[in-house]
């Protein structure tokens, strides 16, 4: 596969020479995701995917077909986006993809934790799964004795997974550095059936691949799929997808950009690993949850009924209210956000604390509106400074296109747009998010205008409805079931869980509870003294240092980080996602 793509991109250049050099390099698909170490790269596709035999053969067949029909042209390339591996049965004139059975059919999806994971890894995995569950109809259930088709999370040498359901035990590696919630969300997205965003057939409309800066033998990692290989369920391309490559994916020096957004204001948006975007969620809901809600969709501004709770709307970022009719509530100790009316005179918005510096953990949402025949002009003023990173982590986001459900321009660092920006319609959404740094912030002004704006295609309308109830009412739960056995015998390394059943169509609250368990410290490993003593031998075979001190240090019963042994019990002052017994 790599050799064919290399030949198509570079002609007579010798692949084996490039591969020999490139195989020694670690690679990265986003600055916000840990690197893939060189010893794993021969086994992974696009940096973090284990392909099935069928998937690999389909990609090879597609490459060979393109090579035959387009020898004089250049191979199309693009960027990672959430795409499905299978097609729906109702698509006329189109067969199922070879991997149609990669869709999960049995719910809840069972998963278990390997003993290699510590409690902090487990906490972050649970947080990521809860984000998927609260926004989709997909449900997960922890079962340490799982059999049949199930996911096993383990600590491998990096972050990687498979695309879609393989059958039987299916691993997701959450190695060191992969504990970030957005990274885990990304890998679970693969397991549910999502490809990288830039793999979409329409990616080249939004992204340009700069092959001069790509590690040569990895040019294959930028190929697009055809419409016959994947389906997007008519969900638009999303430059803010958690599944998208970053700007420097597979870069020869990890600094030069290999992906350029056609709209330069999106350049620092791609590659985020914070959380799911609105269209990440919608894609999974279209694939798995279509028709779960039977009620009329009265959600506004691109929102739709939440298949996890059909009495509520899933709203695009920046929108809130019961029907997505207003601005989303802000999260800040400082007053910010609101719904504002643009008039002919300039009005001003600024970040909390401007210009003396914004606090951390701030989310502000503004919805600006004017009359329907008018537009909104926005211009930045005075000093500008937002924590700088190649993919914006802290940012001001401007949603000013025709599609306010899609991710907007995310702007950070110290160069503000010089010219005024004009919205495509009578609404504009402004989001300020700060989680990492403290910097100057921003100040902007806005007013209504009749100036023209460049527009993008509008979206198809979505209609969803609510499910038939088995018991009249809502929030009727069964009693909690019995606690499962603890996954580990000691050291506060394990968890136990219990389940309850929702007896109505909708229930608020959690289906499964977790507890950290077996908080007694683990007994001393009898091998500890041998290992410690051996590590103290000098090169000439004589004993170095003071082995007695080392032996005493490993004679205490042990606990899993971040717990410490206090009188034989494992304790910690750090806040955890999993309640302690």
Curated annotation (Swiss-Prot):
Cofactor: Zn(2+)
S-S pairs: 137-289, 159-178, 293-313, 315-324, 336-364, 486-517, 490-522, 502-507
Domain CUB: 336-449
Stretches assigned to the TSP type-1 domain: 474-523
CDD domains linked to this entry: CUB, ZnMc_astacin_like
Record's subcellular location: Secreted
Keyword Iron-sulfur: no
Active site: 187
E.C. number: 3.4.24.-
Propeptide section residues: 1-95
GO biological process, one term: proteolysis
GO cellular component: extracellular region
Pfam families in UniProt: Astacin, CUB, TSP_1
Protein role: Metalloprotease. Involved in molting, a process during larval stages in which a new cuticle is formed and the old cuticle is shed.
Protein name per UniProt: Zinc metalloproteinase nas-36
Annotated source species: Brugia malayi
